[in-house]
Curated annotation (Swiss-Prot):
The keyword Membrane applies. One of its GO terms (molecular function) is proton-transporting ATP synthase activity, rotational mechanism. Keywords: ATP synthesis, Cell inner membrane, Cell membrane, CF(0), Hydrogen ion transport, Ion transport, Membrane, Transmembrane, Transmembrane helix, Transport. The keyword Cell membrane applies. GO terms for cellular component: plasma membrane; proton-transporting ATP synthase complex. It comes from Dinoroseobacter shibae (strain DSM 16493 / NCIMB 14021 / DFL 12). It is found in: Cell inner membrane. The gene is atpF2. InterPro entries: ATP_synth_b/b'su_bac/chlpt, ATP_synthase_B_chain. The chain crosses the membrane at residues 27-47. This is ATP synthase subunit b 2. It is a single-pass membrane protein. F(1)F(0) ATP synthase produces ATP from ADP in the presence of a proton or sodium gradient. F-type ATPases consist of two structural domains, F(1) containing the extramembraneous catalytic core and F(0) containing the membrane proton channel, linked together by a central stalk and a peripheral stalk. During catalysis, ATP synthesis in the catalytic domain of F(1) is coupled via a rotary mechanism of the central stalk subunits to proton translocation. F-type ATPases have 2 components, F(1) - the catalytic core - and F(0) - the membrane proton channel. F(1) has five subunits: alpha(3), beta(3), gamma(1), delta(1), epsilon(1). F(0) has three main subunits: a(1), b(2) and c(10-14). The alpha and beta chains form an alternating ring which encloses part of the gamma chain. F(1) is attached to F(0) by a central stalk formed by the gamma and epsilon chains, while a peripheral stalk is formed by the delta and b chains.
Amino acid sequence: MATEATGAVEAAPGMPQLDFSTFPNQIFWLIITLVAIYLILTKVALPRIGSVLAERSGTITNDLAAAEELKLAAVEAEKAYNQALADARAEAQKIVAEARAEIQADLDVATAKADAEIAAKSAEAEKAIAEIREGAMASVTEVATDTAQALVAALLPSAKDADVSAAVAERVKG
């Protein structure tokens, strides 16, 4: 019997799927298979896929909200940083100005003190120079008088020392 069925199949021309005598049987199994696939998809696979998609959507939404909050916090932190930086710069400029004023005041005091010391030393030096000049002039006058007296005594032995001294003093004065 198996050989007869095999022989009939071999004798039939064309593809067995296109044999119209087996269409009702193939359509029945096609419907059963499609219904089984539909039930498996609707009861098992699609709910899992839907839950994964919903979870992903929730995660993305939460992440976007967190990112927006962090962005706002970063903007606020940047504003606070810029304000603190501006305050620090202003404070630094204030400190620099105070330090400059203090240094200038110290410099003015030191300059005034140095000027006073220089003026005092200058007065002392001028006094010493005047004393040295007077001493030098006295020495010059004395040397000139002695020299003149020696010369006059050699040339005119009868000349008086007082007259020679008076003549030298008058000549030295100018």
